[in-house]
Amino acid sequence: MINFESNSPEQTQAFAADFAKKTLNGTVIALIGNLGTGKTTFSQGFANGIGVKQSVISPTFKLVSEYEGERVLNHIDCYRLESSQDFLNIGGENFLNCDNGVTLIEWAERIKEVWHEDWIYIYSVSYTHLRAHET
């Protein structure tokens, strides 16, 4: 388990950028936490770490955003989904094996039925306590 405590959005982004450089293509990262606890902030830093130049925002209404950088970033937001079945209905499983990039899933706790033991789970409690857990 990796523990990281952040005292600011900037620290969260810096941690995420460094973490991104250590991930392999095909990695799925589940971001779990309440509203306003830094999931999108983490995603922004992560995107920066893999060379995404575009502005990264939470795809709450789009559900999925794809970004090109040194590697592809699939950014999924499950906030508006009611169940894992909703995730499957939008073709979410197609983003879980990205050979040329990484998939970040915000609000992953809403799709627990599709969780996999190979995923990395990051629990955001608040900006002052971001806990990364790798299984």
Question: Language-model features: where?
Answer:
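Short beta-strand-centered segment that lines the nucleotide-binding/catalytic pocket of NTP-utilizing
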Residues: 53-67
